[in-house]
Design a protein with these regions (language model features):
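Helix N-cap/capping motif at the beta->alpha junctions
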Residues: 32-41, 62
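Active-site beta3 strand of CheY-like receiver
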Residues: 46-55
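Two-component/phosphorelay signaling modules centered on CheY-like receiver
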Residues: 2, 14-32
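Short amphipathic alpha-helix used as the core "switch/output" element in two-component signaling
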Residues: 41, 63-76
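Receiver (REC) domain active-site loop signature in two-component systems and cognate sites
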Residues: 57, 95
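The feature encodes the CheY-like receiver
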Residues: 58-59, 76, 88, 106
Length: 131
């Protein structure tokens, strides 16, 4: 039996983490980080199948963190989806330019988030099998 995929949720607002966890916890193991610095530690420890990342955070922001994740040989293949209140085209394009595979805006629409996460986790698992 295949293990449950792990999703790392990174957001400096605990309420947002709770919302995302409630949407995804039935199908995924959820771990979380409240800062970019903590996220790097948790990502190395948990080896997530997908990362949901907020943009606006103190310290290392989401764009910087995505660059760091994509530059890390152990984490560069983990898909990153930005989940943020920044809904303008420029923010979305910037997120995709730094390595995110997708971009969803808050407030989160549960069915959309579930489908996007499922699609990207399935694609990652297929890529991993081919490697």
């Amino acid at each position: 039996m295949e293990s449950r995929p792990t999703i790392l949720v990174i957001d400096d607002e605990p309420a947002n983490i709770e919302i995302v966890s409630a949407v995804l916890e039935e199908d995924y193991d959820i771990c979380f980080a409240l800062s970019g610095e903590q996220a790097l530690e948790v990502a190395h420890a948990s080896r997530p199948d997908l990362i949901l990342l907020d943009v606006v955070m103190p310290g290392i922001d989401g764009y910087q963190l995505c660059r760091l994740l994509k530059a890390d040989p152990q984490l560069c293949d983990v898909p990153v989806i930005f989940a943020t209140a920044l809904g303008d085209d420029e923010a979305e394009l910037r997120g995709l330019a730094v390595g995110a595979i997708d971009y969803v805006t808050k407030p989160i629409r549960p069915a959309t988030l579930q489908r996007r996460v499922r699609n990207h986790v399935q694609m990652k698992r297929m890529r991993d099998q081919l490697a």
